[in-house]
Amino acid sequence: MTHSTAKPVPSARRLAYQALYDVLEKDAYSNIVLQRILAEYPLKAEEVHLLTELVYGVLRKYNHLLWIIGKLSTQKVKKLHPSVRILLCLSLYQLLFLTRIPESAAVNESVKIAKKVTHPGNVRFVNGVLRNFLRKKDSFRIPSREEDALLHDALTYNQPRWLIEDWQNAWGVEKADAVFSAFNEIPSMTIRVNPLKQPAADFEKLLSEKGIEAAPIPYLPEGFTIKSGANHFFGTFLKEGLAYVQSASSMVPAKVLSPKAGETVLDMCAAPGSKTTQMAEMMGNEGSIDAWDLYPHKIALIKKNAKKEGIIIIHAGARDATKPMPAVHEKYDKVLLDAPCSGLGVLSHKVEIRWRRTREDLQEFPPLQKALLEEAARYVKKGGTLVYSTCTLNSKENEDIVTAFLRDHPEFAPIDFQLEGLGASEKGMLTIWPDQAQSDGFFVAKLEKRSEE
């Protein structure tokens, strides 16, 4: 007689609860948590879909859900036990936005989970709040802009009030609304074909043969937006290094730097290696790329990705890029500084960032970015190119950093560039707007170190 030792597979709702707890209470990242869960449990396709829908859905609607809980609860939302708050959000999201799910299933499953993760008093509270919602569900109307503009926008766009206030003041209400709306769209999968293993034209044909609908990205010869059949990429294509999942905007800095075969290149803040491997592929695996990052485990990830993609020109090492390294002064033809930043351009797929950042946090980044750019400038050869990029839309981390740098460094000049579908740079600087690019928000600046005359 044989006995199965297979671990029981929890329901999608139970796993969604755990994922949300890790993200909201332990500062984990949603994409990493979901990857771990999917690697651990053999879920059916419909369970995977429900799990991801619940996790990302709750994070996208978090403000709205907490507001409703506040209307229903006799206790202040902030004082509720985290397990209670998360279970209520999980249930209310299903009741409000997933109409195909029966109300009884959403409520009963949450009560069942509550019995496993908290004490009987909290179980009764969860059950009571949800039953109360079902009685009053048609009475929860978001205030109009005329009644309370800031609350209306915070609940409609599910962004923190301080960010709505800051961006509406900076860009005007219409532009800010368009950006916030874009952040709440579910992002399409975009991939970069590895030309070292398969030319882009051949890969497009392969996609078509497998019934995968894909559209080329106009400004990226090796880039494709996957319209349908994305599940194929979590098999052969990625494991064999034929393609790499990367946002379209994230591919732009390397495109603008435009490294050539035989050149020496530095990627100063390289992990996880997406731009590093992209540059190596652009160089045809000829030349040399030094890839730095602060943490050894991230260096291991760069090496792993390079090996999988068949790249031999990347030399990755742990370095504190804020510390001077005279040995490599004016060594490189091209330098990419994709600087650490507030991440306020990637709120569509790193949804939780909006709930973690504060206005005060934004003050931490410019001093670091300025220090890194000062070091980057030393490593570029005369006549060489330096690209500075971030994945934020905060001008103090973008235009202000580059403008101040150019004022202090007359040996550098901005170089204008143009990309199909994204427009032209101004004074060597380009902001990629998520509402226009249907991708992440990014900032890219291209500078040249003048040759001595």
Give the positions of each predicted feature.
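S-adenosylmethionine
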Residues: 1-453
